Each structure stands twice: as C-alpha cells, then as structure tokens.
C-alpha cells in the first residue's frame, strides 16, 4: 500500500492505510516516536505518500515527521482550511480551529446534521448542518483530564478508578460519576441546543480514546473509532482531485 494516514493526537499516535476514501485497519501506539521502541519504529509502513495530521506538541511531532520522511517519498501535513469536501468552518480564522476537529467534521459529513463529540485529552463538541456548514462548538476538559487535574491539586483524590452511579456513596465512584456526568451533560445540552437551533433531529457521533466509558450514558450515540482518520482520508482524496 503506497498511501497511509497518520493521526498524532495529544495522547495517542494512530495510523491506517488509505482505502479509497476511507481509512483501513487502524493501529495505535502510545504517544509519538519517543514512546515507541526500536521494533515498533521499524514496523512503521513505508510508501509513496504519508498524510499527517497532528495536534501534538512540536517536540513530539517533529521526530515522527522525520521518521516518516525516511519511509515515504512525500509527507503531506494537513492544515485546517475554511472549506473542504463540502464542509465550511465557522471560525473567522480557520487556522485556529484544531485539525483534529476539522478532520472529524470531514469524516462526519455524510451523517449531517450531526453533533460530533471527541473525547481525548480534551472534550470537543462541534455541530455540522446538513448543508455542510459548521455551526461552532465547545472545548472542555475530558473526564480523564478532570480526574488528573483534581489529583494534581489534591493527591488524596485518585486519578482513576470508580464506577458511574447517579448518587455515589464512596469517593472513587463519586469522582467517576461527577467527571463522566459533566461530560455527558455538556454533550446532551449541546445536542439539545443544536436541535432547537437547526430545527431538525441531529445525530450524535462520538469518537476518541476516552469515549467508550461514556457510551452507556449516551444511548443514542454512534461510536466511530476512526472518525479523524476517515476525515483524513476524505482530505487526501480531495487533495488528489484535479
């Protein structure tokens, strides 16, 4: 396979072959080149074109780009643009709109009207109308980041553990219930607003490594694990068009 898709997130590095206008089988690693041993680096694919999207810090992005440049004839870095593949970004300055959010919207274009919720280091929420117009969104801490922040300020509060219950009777469950519940409430409120604003039913798509624990609390949501990579595939297909 000569064309590959690479997504460097804040916490994970994922890649997949480009199959038509979709991502193929996804592989994921802990963060970036510094988190991958020599055997893992040697197993990275090679080919003609690597399409790369990164929201990671330059210290993590640059070594991975250098690694890919040794394996591919071309390495193409994706940037957010005002319009692509029928999606129009609402930001006055599209360069300030995260490329992961941009690609998630490209991946969700066929599901519009849709609310896209990404759960990783951050919780991102974006609304896309049936006409491809982005109606804005929100950014908050994800449940994992909430837990880590609480633990950093109050070490007696564990950074993980516990189950979701509506009214917890121990600290671990209370933390999970509070942080997961806060994320779910923000998603639900945003979905309600989107449906009132657009005047039509709006689908809910959820993606990201932190999404699975929230899915039982969002029964109407569809989980799309490879949404950003699918969006990257859409971008690559559009870029290849004359």
From Swiss-Prot:
InterPro entries in UniProt: ATPase_NBD, Type_III_PanK
GO molecular function annotations of the record: ATP binding; pantothenate kinase activity
Known pathway: Cofactor biosynthesis; coenzyme A biosynthesis; CoA from (R)-pantothenate: step 1/5
Ribosomal protein in keyword set: no
GO BP terms in the entry: coenzyme A biosynthetic process
UniProt record similarity statement: Belongs to the type III pantothenate kinase family.
UniProt-recorded name of the protein: Type III pantothenate kinase
